[in-house]
Amino acid sequence: MDTMIDIKGLSIDELERFLLGKGKERYRARQIFKWLYQRGATSFAEMTDLAKELRRDLEETARISTLSPEALEISRDGTRKYLFRLDDGCSVESVLIPEEDRNTLCISSQVGCAMACEFCLTGTFRLTRNLTTAEIVNQVCAVQRDVPVRNIVFMGMGEPLANLDNVIRALQIMLHDDGLQFSTRRITVSTAGLVPEMERLGRSVTVNLAVSLNATTDELRDRIMPINRKYPLAVLLDACRRFPLPGRRKITIEYVLLGGVNDTLDDAKRLVRLLSDIPSKINLIPFNEHEGCSFRSPSQDAIDRFHRYLLDKHFTVITRSSRGADISAACGQLKGKLDALKPSGAGKQIEVSDSTNEVT
């Protein structure tokens, strides 16, 4: 059994305590963080401003994990889907969405998902396990070696707030000045609506929050999102009102438009009433059809009508284009399996590594 500490699984405070336990100076933690996250060091030998004695000690008691993509698929629209094989054979996917002025990376927090949302392909796979802090952070590090990343969204495989300890620790690494140096404005954590964990997230770190709402009545949300039976709309929306928002930031409300299910004008009217006193902006996401799911994409008329009504009521609203759908990288299509990356005429597949164990 591997008893060595994965150094990339530690927050700066935990790394300081680890070093203090060895009789070393606290400031060494900041030096190590910079080597890991700003210089991309993969061995302690590279950390030349550390004393040789400390480097030898670290080599004997700690390790630096890495991830390399086992496969990469590139969409016609430039979206890049990375498949990472973890050290226990499990796999997860991350998606890079390119824009003119920024790249947004969508990362995973779990292998599979227990939320069982009816419209989400990931939800059809049972939850296998939580990702470790290092596995979350290493998705960002791996993609940054390939292309620059400006924004991070926790909207990949899994429910981030169901893995809150590791997600918070990963966020602390991403936000730290000696870590990955992301701005709090550039990171968004999405949730299906785990209310107690929303409150703890708000107390622990300052990041943007996205709530996957998708219905305007408890009857419908109970059916398509089972978590609603535990935390119904009134409870969830009250938690949104209490969530600490710095400055003039708003909660992002994600609303997947399901054809003939939740895309009517009456749905739009109820949504406006529900959000009337919550600082929010709305992302409309036309459903991406996938095999084995009975839901259908909404008509363009229904999308336009819904969008216009929200605009007329002075909401900030964006209808998201379906990026990466030709390589099953669009919202709700991630499944973390090699069979998701079979070559097709639509996307280009690039095999990056034949290894089945990418964590070292």
Swiss-Prot record:
<dbReference type="InterPro" id="IPR040072">
    <property type="entry name" value="Methyltransferase_A"/>
</dbReference>
<keyword id="KW-0808">Transferase</keyword>
<feature type="binding site">
    <location>
        <begin position="212"/>
        <end position="214"/>
    </location>
    <ligand>
        <name>S-adenosyl-L-methionine</name>
    </ligand>
</feature>
<feature type="binding site">
    <location>
        <position position="288"/>
    </location>
    <ligand>
        <name>S-adenosyl-L-methionine</name>
    </ligand>
</feature>
<dbReference type="GO" id="GO:0070040">
    <property type="term" value="F:rRNA (adenine(2503)-C2-)-methyltransferase activity"/>
</dbReference>
<dbReference type="InterPro" id="IPR013785">
    <property type="entry name" value="Aldolase_TIM"/>
</dbReference>
<feature type="domain" description="Radical SAM core">
    <location>
        <begin position="99"/>
        <end position="326"/>
    </location>
</feature>
<keyword id="KW-0698">rRNA processing</keyword>
<comment type="function">
    <text>Specifically methylates position 2 of adenine 2503 in 23S rRNA and position 2 of adenine 37 in tRNAs. m2A2503 modification seems to play a crucial role in the proofreading step occurring at the peptidyl transferase center and thus would serve to optimize ribosomal fidelity.</text>
</comment>
<keyword id="KW-1015">Disulfide bond</keyword>
<dbReference type="GO" id="GO:0051539">
    <property type="term" value="F:4 iron, 4 sulfur cluster binding"/>
</dbReference>
<keyword id="KW-0411">Iron-sulfur</keyword>
<keyword id="KW-0408">Iron</keyword>
<dbReference type="GO" id="GO:0000049">
    <property type="term" value="F:tRNA binding"/>
</dbReference>
<dbReference type="GO" id="GO:0030488">
    <property type="term" value="P:tRNA methylation"/>
</dbReference>
<dbReference type="GO" id="GO:0070475">
    <property type="term" value="P:rRNA base methylation"/>
</dbReference>
<dbReference type="Pfam" id="PF21016">
    <property type="entry name" value="RlmN_N"/>
</dbReference>
<feature type="active site" description="Proton acceptor">
    <location>
        <position position="93"/>
    </location>
</feature>
<feature type="disulfide bond" description="(transient)">
    <location>
        <begin position="106"/>
        <end position="331"/>
    </location>
</feature>
<feature type="binding site">
    <location>
        <position position="113"/>
    </location>
    <ligand>
        <name>[4Fe-4S] cluster</name>
    </ligand>
</feature>
<dbReference type="GO" id="GO:0019843">
    <property type="term" value="F:rRNA binding"/>
</dbReference>
<feature type="binding site">
    <location>
        <position position="117"/>
    </location>
    <ligand>
        <name>[4Fe-4S] cluster</name>
    </ligand>
</feature>
<keyword id="KW-0489">Methyltransferase</keyword>
<dbReference type="InterPro" id="IPR007197">
    <property type="entry name" value="rSAM"/>
</dbReference>
<dbReference type="InterPro" id="IPR048641">
    <property type="entry name" value="RlmN_N"/>
</dbReference>
<feature type="active site" description="S-methylcysteine intermediate">
    <location>
        <position position="331"/>
    </location>
</feature>
<dbReference type="InterPro" id="IPR004383">
    <property type="entry name" value="rRNA_lsu_MTrfase_RlmN/Cfr"/>
</dbReference>
<dbReference type="Pfam" id="PF04055">
    <property type="entry name" value="Radical_SAM"/>
</dbReference>
<comment type="similarity">
    <text>Belongs to the radical SAM superfamily. RlmN family.</text>
</comment>
<feature type="binding site">
    <location>
        <position position="190"/>
    </location>
    <ligand>
        <name>S-adenosyl-L-methionine</name>
    </ligand>
</feature>
<keyword id="KW-0819">tRNA processing</keyword>
<protein>
    <recommendedName>
        <fullName>Dual-specificity RNA methyltransferase RlmN</fullName>
        <ecNumber>2.1.1.192</ecNumber>
    </recommendedName>
</protein>
<dbReference type="GO" id="GO:0002935">
    <property type="term" value="F:tRNA (adenine(37)-C2)-methyltransferase activity"/>
</dbReference>
<feature type="binding site">
    <location>
        <position position="120"/>
    </location>
    <ligand>
        <name>[4Fe-4S] cluster</name>
    </ligand>
</feature>
<dbReference type="InterPro" id="IPR027492">
    <property type="entry name" value="RNA_MTrfase_RlmN"/>
</dbReference>
<dbReference type="GO" id="GO:0005737">
    <property type="term" value="C:cytoplasm"/>
</dbReference>
<keyword id="KW-0479">Metal-binding</keyword>
<keyword id="KW-0963">Cytoplasm</keyword>
<dbReference type="GO" id="GO:0046872">
    <property type="term" value="F:metal ion binding"/>
</dbReference>
<keyword id="KW-0004">4Fe-4S</keyword>
<keyword id="KW-0949">S-adenosyl-L-methionine</keyword>
<feature type="binding site">
    <location>
        <begin position="158"/>
        <end position="159"/>
    </location>
    <ligand>
        <name>S-adenosyl-L-methionine</name>
    </ligand>
</feature>
